[in-house]
């Protein structure tokens, strides 16, 4: 792959190979950087140096476990909020202060703040959303939970060589029997540790295991077990989209005939350019049931993908909601006491009303 310059950072061929790999298959083995080196033709030390540089350049945000929120007993939802333009930033900051808000963006739509929230099993999601609606001074809020998951699995083609109309070429996490599991205290301990950002060490899982008083083999085995049980979707990197050269982040939303929603959902999910694809509820002021996230290097590339989708599906009633500002993007922290602390400080009796 030719070298690629993003801002002040130049990504050579090995950088691009490494970034493409670790988004989907960071090795859950005792010496992961050595395993990655075998894939890209470098030594363990070279890969560690490369990884550390990409982390310092803030292209790699984090490497950690990605868990299935529902399987852990949490409830989550996308939420759309409309706030007066004069106070969007202040409202977004109030929303971002909630420990369960993992993503929060300003988008070019009447609903101008879009955020995702997850709450523990002993908390009511609607109550937390009502409180945030109140605190933000919102004029309108729509809760848009996942009714069906067709695909989730960000795979940014850092080389930008893949056609936007290409079909999915990697396995992506799709809907299964996603019912909450009863976790043992030992499993909770592993979740708490595996959600932490990976350290740049030859044997990083040994350090994690040591903090738990467990062996490295036991932790690696437990991680694979969590994947097998469907509690963990994968262990992988999350990149800073913009710093990796993906300046266009569009949420494509599609109005489709209700009886054919699944057919169109699976078609949309089949595109490699679509990282997330869901069915969500509609409202009188929101007729779009299908959501497909598209990340690209430019708006032109996004529109190229959408043109291919239109040509294949025949769908024409859609909107592209571009993110114009990122307020927050983290991974959800599970079993964190901050949830209870936030609730005690912010929830009012009126928030619990339907």
Regions found by a protein language model. Give the residues of each.
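A compositional/biophysical signature of low hydrophobicity enriched in polar/charged and small residues
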Residues: 1-354
